[in-house]
From Swiss-Prot:
Residues 506-648 form the Flavodoxin-like domain. GO terms for cellular component: cytosol. Keywords: Electron transport, FAD, Flavoprotein, FMN, Heme, Iron, Metal-binding, Monooxygenase, Multifunctional enzyme, NADP, Oxidoreductase, Transport. Its cofactor is FAD; FMN; heme. In the N-terminal section; belongs to the cytochrome P450 family. Its EC number is 1.14.14.1, 1.6.2.4. Gene clusters encoding host-selective toxins (HSTs) are localized on conditionally dispensable chromosomes (CDCs), also called supernumerary chromosomes, where they are present in multiple copies. The CDCs are not essential for saprophytic growth but controls host-selective pathogenicity. Residues 688-932 form the FAD-binding FR-type domain. Binds 1 FAD. The keyword Oxidoreductase applies. The keyword Transmembrane helix does not apply. The record marks T278 as: Important for catalytic activity. This is Bifunctional cytochrome P450/NADPH--P450 reductase ALT2.
Length: 1103
């Protein structure tokens, strides 16, 4: 390939970068000549390539890249494939120009959402998805190749969806070969964007028109999918501090405006696309290098074993895995998911000391080359050697030697999220598996907008010879996320002590873009009060310009952003620079700085500057400056508390500003001034036997498109015992959306105190009488806002319609009677509250409204676990009932649409997250619905949907019982149980076939034979052509009769219709068998059933 001479020097004497000549068709420029590897290795530090209609300058040198990362001369250009992605993700943070007001506003709103505290709080959701992947691998066994890129894409897509918008794609529950449509569309649009960026528009529009049509169609599909998520959240709001809620509700701190819906869509798509593809690439290449470098793999595993052992990985573990972080850094150095980025000059400029570039000229920095600079990384720069990325060596890297997360203000704000997810994923994989390399694999690269290895597979073997079930148990052993709680007993005698006898106060000042400093300010305020200090004020830095307090010590907590102050500290720093010597005398101060080592050149620059300016101009430093590196080996909160304990508080104590306060290295010994007694909430105290359990996990078990099935894991109160087959009563709460609707309707504040008196106390059981209670708590926890309105309720409401609205009264009266009531109210679960919202002309008092409601009653759910499965814990399996469908209220209401109500309890359960409390009480099963663990009695279990719950508990207990017996007998396997069948009906194998892996393990152990029926996919394997479970029973009639004659017990769990259909099949069969065996003389099946022995045919019917 020939290279032209540099162009003639400009008037300033500097040539443009040399341009690669086309070797084939000049009108196509270098399109047919592009070979990324050859370009980066053979054409020098700076050159230019021609795409026919435009040219790009290419830079491969670290030194020149350092120039281009100077944001006073150059800014990011969303060029190339990124520019083409605007059709998909609009003006998101990835694609919009920095000076675009939409980018600036979105950045101000979104950047604080990625502070360390929020990211740390996402750990449970990240672990949830990672556990799904690991359990899937364990159940595949060591003989099945794992397609690494596919698995990592599932992991990262599901994680970012769950953490940011509380949505589950459930990718790991899809059959192999059936890709999540969203993920498939993402890969397609990214691939086509890259192709488009390398071709002239006339080729894209005229030659590639079919590809462009597909690209545009999939872009619309992706945007529509995000729009649906947003609409769903608005219709079904959740009290969750996630990215979606924040983007919909937070205001731009400068303009006071919220983000438009279009910008919310743009940025959510940006996170989904840019976030999951890049992290998937990082994890895929990390697996490749670990497989290629056994010594690195062994060292990384040893670190995980020493730090975590076999316990559940917690947030505090991640900062104690420095070698694993070095492995990921080295992976990013060699295989940056995004091979570079574009910048443009802010004005005509000269780069590399000699090349002229015009204003707005697109310049591409190839970081694949910059990251392999031998002057920085040595002659072995192309080799994978994590030791070169140890913290000590990493801190010594020259500027711009490592930029996988971009530069400056346009650096990736999701970096902490990606690194936490990546460290967690690799640590969990190494903790639980031995990795088996495919010796025949040779690295091949696939380039879209990111880079990933093609065809990479490995096999995995659970470590230490564990079986898949053992891996599952190990993942959920004592984790520290929750501990068994004592049963509440009115008052537990606990004391909270706070002293306020210190005469001094603190002024706390914070400044950061991400909100981290603000969180630390709140922590300091709490700790200061605990130690006897008052807090005079908590302010942002810009608010104390020329107002630095002199009467109290000032603690300033701040961060740097590429060497510059945060937005809310810029004025403060500017003012400090203008102060003169002695001007700040009398000010006593301490500074704490936050930063991240990946920006080593500007680490703690602003905190150091503030500390220096204060001291130089007369202020007194009361404690040495503290710092915390959020990329370091400890977490920021520990660093901060260590600093306050060792330096700040001891100084204050020595100056007698914390009188009568004992420090004792942060010990919790304090003078008693305030006594706080803890007791049960009134709604719990009114019901005997209820105590608090703690949620440890809440996971979805079904795919989109069917009513959601979920499993809730609870840490039970201490002393709580149950049997497999028992039920758990729970106290639900109304949705925050319904509570807010009531408050708005009656013009109440959430904190308004309401007192209820009644002359007929016995009619108001369940309501708090004669005691003040906050309105928000009354409507959340005491009355059922979603209960279907009775015909009488509607008649009462009709009588309260304003006299000048006769039409509304007629509508209500028509709804209260006959078929209209059944079809338009009862079937659609329309509540009194729904009617008040729909018809504001109903004039009802608060007392009248309460009189129409029923107290909230407990709901019962079957345990889906056995008591010995995980002592102290239990699971419930439930269906989220019927929320979300739009229904027409009635013809006579002019087809006004109303949302069908979901079930109160199931909707409430679906909102719970780890560490939430739930009040529970034991509800024993019928004596006939227990498995007596008889080894000689056959069992026939029949279930539909979540009716499978008690049978999972039965099988768990049987498995553990066999294992215990084998242990006592000194053999590997105990004798088998009698034949056990499970007939299970659901919609389809890829939709809601619950506990597939668990049941497969039970079958492999010889504990059960599973027979399925799929109502939406009766041709699927395993259904024997049956849509419903009664059909499957009829197909097995002969063997069922044989088992009945052997004394089999039958257990049925499901809805009333299903149970009736089951008996319609089995009743005549078993009745006839008993007649033939002369065990009954009854000719009537119904009468025969009443003569059966206890537990011979037992039913649990859903109500």
């Amino acid at each position: 390939m020939a290279i032209s001479s540099p162009s003639q020097a400009r008037s300033v004497g500097n040539p443009s970068p040399r341009c690669v000549k086309s070797s084939t068709y000049p009108f196509l420029g270098n399109i047919l000549d592009i070979d990324p590897d050859n370009f980066t290795k053979s054409l020098g530090d700076v050159y230019m390539i021609n795409y026919g209609s435009y040219r790009d300058v290419i830079v491969t040198s670290r030194k020149v890249a350092q120039e281009l990362c100077d944001e006073s001369r150059f800014c990011k250009l969303p060029g190339g494939a990124i520019d083409r992605m605007k059709r998909v993700i609009g003006n998101g943070l990835f694609t919009a120009e920095t000076r675009d007001p939409r980018w600036q506003s979105a950045h101000r709103v979104i950047a604080p959402l990625f502070n360390p505290m929020r990211i740390r709080g996402m750990m449970d959701d990240m672990r949830d998805v990672c556990e799904q992947m690991c359990l899937r691998w364990a159940r595949f066994g060591p003989g099945v190749p794992i397609k690494i890129c596919d698995e990592m894409t599932k992991l990262t897509l599901d994680t970012i969806a769950l953490c940011t918008v509380d949505h589950r794609f459930n990718s790991f529950y899809r059959p192999d070969g059936i890709e999540e449509p969203f993920a498939e569309a993402v890969v397609n649009v990214m691939t086509d964007s890259l192709i488009q960026s390398n071709l002239p528009d006339w080729i894209n529009n005229w030659v590639r028109f079919r590809s462009m049509n597909k690209f545009n169609r999939q872009a619309d599909e992706l945007r529509h999918a995000i729009e649906e998520l947003i609409e769903s959240r608005r219709k079904n709001p959740v009290d969750r501090n996630d990215l979606l809620n924040a983007m919909l509700s937070h205001e731009d701190p400068e303009t006071g405006q919220r983000l438009s819906d279009e910008l919310v869509v743009d940025n959510l798509l940006t996170f989904f696309i840019a976030g999951h593809e890049t992290t998937s690439s990082l994890l895929s290449f990390c697996m490749y290098y670990l497989l290629e470098c056994p010594d690195v793999l062994q060292k990384a595993r040893a670190e995980v074993h020493a730090t975590v052992g076999t316990s559940t990985i917690m947030p505090e573990h991640l900062s104690k895995l420095p070698y694993l972080e070095s492995v990921l850094r080295e992976t990013l150095r060699l295989r940056d998911p995004g091979p570079g980025f574009f910048v443009k000059p802010l004005r005509d400029d000269v780069i590399a000391g000699k090349y002229f570039v015009k204003k707005d000229q697109s310049i591409f920095i190839v970081f694949d080359s910059v990251h392999r600079d031998p002057d920085v990384y040595g002659d072995d720069a192309d080799e994978f050697r994590p030791e070169r990325m140890s913290q000590e060596k990493f801190d010594q890297l020259p500027p711009c030697a490592y930029k996988p997360f971009g530069n400056g203000v346009r650096a990736c704000i999701g970096r902490p999220f990606a690194m936490q997810q990546a460290i967690l994923a690799v640590a969990m994989i190494l903790q639980h598996f031995d990795l088996i390399k495919d010796e025949s694999y040779k690295l091949k690269i696939h380039v879209t907008m990111t880079v990933r290895p093609i065809g990479l597979t490995m096999k995995v073997r659970p470590r230490e010879g564990l079986r898949a079930t053992d891996v599952n148990l190990r993942m959920h052993q004592a984790s520290g996320t929750a501990t068994p709680k004592p049963l509440a007993s009115g008052t537990d005698g606990s004391m909270l002590t706070v002293t306020k006898n210190g005469p001094m106060h603190l002024a706390i000042v914070h400044a950061s873009n991400s909100g981290t400093s603000e969180a630390l300010a709140g922590l300091l305020a709490s700790n200061a009060v605990d130690r006897g200090l008052g807090v005079k004020s908590i302010s942002v830095a810009n608010d104390i310009v020329e107002k630095l307090p002199r009467d109290v010590p000032v603690v300033i907590i701040t961060a740097s952003y590429n060497g510059e102050p945060s937005r809310n500290a810029a004025d403060f720093v500017s003012w400090l620079k203008s102060t003169k010597q002695h001007e700040l005398e009398g000010v006593r101060y301490a500074v704490f700085g936050c930063g991240h080592r990946d920006w080593a050149s500007s680490l703690f620059a602003v905190p150091k500057l503030i500390d220096s300016l204060l001291s130089t101009n007369g202020a007194e430093q009361i404690a040495q400056m503290g710092t915390s590196d959020t990329g370091g080996s400890t977490d920021i909160y520990s660093d901060f508390e260590d600093w306050t304990t060792k330096f700040l508080f001891p100084y204050l104590n020595s100056k007698q500003e914390m009188k009568d306060t004992k420090l004792n290295s942060g010990a919790d010994t304090r003078d008693v001034d305030l006594h706080v007694s803890l007791g049960k909430p009134p709604r719990v105290a009114m019901r005997k036997g209820f105590a608090a359990a703690t949620v440890t996990k809440n996971r979805s078990l079904s795919a989109p498109g069917v009513p959601e099935k979920c499993e809730l894991e609870l840490c039970l109160p201490d002393g709580f015992t149950y049997k497999a087959g028992d039920h758990l009563q729970i106290l639900p709460r109304n949705s925050s959306n319904d509570v807010q609707s009531v408050l708005r309707h009656f013009h109440l504040e959430a904190e308004t105190l309401v007192s209820i008196q009644s002359a007929h106390r016995n009619k108001r059981l369940g309501l708090p009488l004669d005691v003040p209670i906050m309105a928000s708590e009354l409507f959340a926890a005491y009355v059922e806002l979603g209960r279907t309105a009775s015909s009488r309720n509607i008649h009462v409401l009709a009588g309260l319609v304003r006299s000048d609205k006769p039409k509304i009264k007629r509508i209500l009266l028509s709804l209260a009677n006959g078929e209209s009531y059944k079809t338009e109210v009862l079937d659609k679960r329309i509540s009194v509250l729904d009617l008040l919202k729909q018809f504001p002309d109903i004039e009802i008092s608060l007392a009248g409204f309460l009189s129409l409601l029923m107290p909230i009653r407990p709901r019962s759910y079957s345990f889906s676990s056995g008591p010995n499965w995980k002592p102290g814990f239990a699971t419930l399996t439930y269906t989220v009932v019927g929320a979300g469908k739009l229904v027409s209220k009635a013809k006579m209401t002019e087809h006004v649409a109303m949302s069908m109500r979901g079930g109160l309890a199931s909707t409430f359960l679906s909102t719970l997250s780890a560490r939430d409390d739930l009040y529970v009480s034991l509800d024993p099963a019928s004596p006939s619905f227990y498995d007596d663990q008889s080894v000689s009695c056959p069992i026939i279990m029949i279930a539909a949907g979540t009716g499978i719950a008690p049978f999972i508990g039965f099988l768990q207990e049987r498995k553990l019982s066999l294992a215990h017996t084998a242990l006592l007998q000194g053999s590997k396997k105990a004798g088998p149980y009698a034949r056990t069948l499970l007939f299970f009906g659901c919609r389809g194998p890829a939709l809601d076939s619950l506990y597939t892996e668990e049941l497969a393990a039970f079958e492999a152990d010889g504990l059960v034979e599973v027979r399925r029926a799929f109502s939406r996919d009766h041709t699927a394997a395993g259904s024997n052509g049956c849509k419903y479970v009664d059909q499957r029973l009829a197909a097995s009639a002969e063997e069922l009769v044989e088992l009945w004659r052997l004394g089999a017990r039958v257990f049925v769990c499901g809805g009333k219709k299903m149970a009736n259909n089951v008996f319609d099949v089995l009743g005549p069969l078993f009745h006839e068998a008993d007649k033939l065996d002369q065990k009954t003389a009854e000719d009537d099946v119904g009468k025969w059933r009443t003569t059966l022995g206890k537990g011979r045919y037992a039913e649990e019917i859903f109500i």
